[in-house]
Amino acid sequence: MIPLSYRPGGNMNILLISLPEKNKDMKLEATEVLPLALYSLSSVLKCQGYEVSIIDPCEFVYLDEKENAETTCVTLIEECLEEGYDIVGFSVNTFNWGITKTVVNQISWKKNTTVVLGGLHVSVFDEYSLLTTKADIIMRGEGELTWCELVATLKNVAPLDTIKGITYKSGKNIIRNPDRGAMTIEDLEALPLPDYELLPIDNPYVEMPVESSRGCQFSCSFCSIPHRHNWRGLCEIQVIERVKHAKRHMKNIMRGGNILFVDDCFSMHPKRAIKILDALHKCYGEEMKYFIEARISNILSGEFLEGFQRNLISQMQIGVECGYDEGLKKIKKGLTIAQLYKGLRIIEEKGLSSVANLSFIIGFPWEDFGTIEKTLDTVEYIVNRFGILCRVNWFMLLPSDC
């Protein structure tokens, strides 16, 4: 519950948690990439002078599951709560929402602990998330600035009604404050480097995530990205510093040693992307590889692959999503099949077919067997003609997809 009083001026002790997903066998499943948001938020809050601890998803996975997955999670969290935390925050997405909801409701929370949920899923279903859990506050949208304001407000026992971007319980009522706008480039560049010192020694991670931009300049109809037509790219110097920081902490991950750019579109500003890759090549040569996401439109412009350091890329993921022109128009992809094939020929000429990775979606609401077959025919042609890996996924209706 939201406590009636904190000690004004006293320090705040915060616990940040991201629960793992459950697989088809109902067992907890580890991912290969660490939850960047958790470690970034830890640094932000520590810079404000607060005490922060993290429970990484892999710590739940590595426990002996003598009972069910939820009980395993509840047991570990309740043991940690004995340390006495003022605020406990959960990072929530659609895939871990089910287990997060159950765990939050099964924990016996102390009266002086505030429970906060953040992430895309609860940002969309904020009121429902409060009505169905013991959580006190929902953090909507980008959370770094909102978290700082929220913790300061709770610390000073001030009203919550001035904090943009939160939904909260007030007695039997649910209050939804106005939205907070997207963070500016200046805001993003002012963020401290992620708190990788808190990574568990034993972990399954194979790549270090780095954020060089947020948002997307486009607005595909199926996409869950919250900030459309609002791409914000960090300057090259900032990006290189973040990569260097990740490189210094490569020893903290158990396997691998590559960088994963978590940007929704690394190639959005082609000249900037090339400058970043060139600078990284000067720093590390071919010692490290980089995962990036790109758009066919950027490849067609000719700028992105001009002087491209092919040996630096571990994977270049490109979202195509639909294998026929009518479908591409419906999802507002801004692409035709003819343009796709032209872009793939450029990729082939640059010797990048082996690292390219195309994604497709089947089962859009308007599709039938005939239209799905068109996409599968396109995929078959690409694999046979260009030797490029294609991934086909069923359409999944997730928050903000429509």
Description of each model-found segment:
Residues 25-38:
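Glycine- and acidic-residue-enriched helix-capping/strand-helix junction motifs
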Residues 49-50, 107-113, 158-159, 281-288, ...:
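Short helix-capping segments at alpha-helix termini
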Residues 33, 186-355, 362-364:
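Radical SAM [4Fe-4S] cluster-binding motif and immediate context
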Residues 18, 56-61, 91, 227, ...:
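Residue-level recognition of beta-strand->loop/alpha-helix junctions
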Residues 6, 12-15, 20-27, 163, ...:
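N-terminal [4Fe-4S]-dependent radical SAM core
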Residues 128-131, 366-380:
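Catalytic cores of alpha/beta
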Residues 23, 61-63, 171, 218, ...:
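Flexible glycine/acidic-rich beta-alpha junction loops that bind and position SAM and/or redox cofactors
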Residues 44-182, 400:
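Glycine-rich beta-alpha loop elements in corrinoid/cobalamin-binding modules
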